Amino acid sequence: MTEPSEILVVTATYNEMETLPRLVEAIFGSLPAVDILVVDDNSPDGTGQWCEKYSQANARLRCLRRSGKLGIGSAIADGLRYAIDQGYRYVVTMDADFSHPPEKISDLLAAIQQSDGTPIDVVIGSRYVKGGNIQGWPWYRHLMSRGINTYSRWVLGLPVRDCSGNFRCYRASALASLNWE
C-alpha cells in the first residue's frame, strides 16, 4: 500500500489527452511521493478514460470526472475542496498543457514551507517576475494578460504581479478556513 502524501497536485482537463500522460510522468519524475488529482470535464478525446485506467496502476493518481464542460474555475475549486476533505497539507494547482513546468513544483513547495514564524499560505508561480516566462502566446494574448493583471492589482490592491495565473501552492489549512458556499 502506498503511504499517503501530504501534497496534492491538482490539474483541470478538457481534451488534454495529448499532454496529460507526459505531464503525469513528469510530475512523478520530479516528485514521486506526491498525489495527483485530475479534474476532467468529460473530455471527448479520452482524457478521463486514460486517467481512470492509469489510476488503477498508480495509486497516487486520482480522477474526478465531471458530467460536462463546467470550466477551469470550478474544476480547481473542486480540487481544492477535495484536498481539504482528504486531509492534504499542501495543494499545488497547475495547467495540464505544460504551460507550468513540473520541475518547478519543488520550488513552490520550498517557498511555502520556509517560515520565520509566520506561515505562508499561498505561493504564486508568477510569469511576470525575474525567471518567469510565457512561451507560445501571440503578442495580443501577452498584452491582454498584462492588462488584466495590472488592472486587478490596481482595483483589488493586491501586491502580486500575476493575479490570473494558475501555478500556485496553497496551505490547505488556510483554504479550509474559507467559506466555500
What is each stretch, according to the model?
Residues 24, 33-43, 64-65, 94:
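Short beta-strand/loop segment that forms part of the nucleotide-sugar
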Residues 18-22, 45-54:
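Acidic helix N-cap motif at the loop->helix transition within catalytic regions
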Residues 5-7, 28-38, 46, 60-61:
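Short loop->beta transition adjacent to catalytic acidic/histidine clusters or analogous donor-positioning motifs
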Residues 40-49, 98:
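A conserved acidic beta->alpha catalytic loop
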Residues 1-26:
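N-proximal low-complexity "stem/linker" segments adjacent to membrane-targeting elements
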Residues 66-85, 90, 102-181:
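Acceptor/aglycone-binding surface of glycosyltransferases and processive sugar-polymer synthases
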Residues 9, 36, 63, 91, ...:
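Hydrophobic/aromatic residues located in beta-strands of well-ordered beta-sheets
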Residues 94, 98-101:
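Hydrophobic, well-structured modules enriched for small/aliphatic residues and gly/pro motifs
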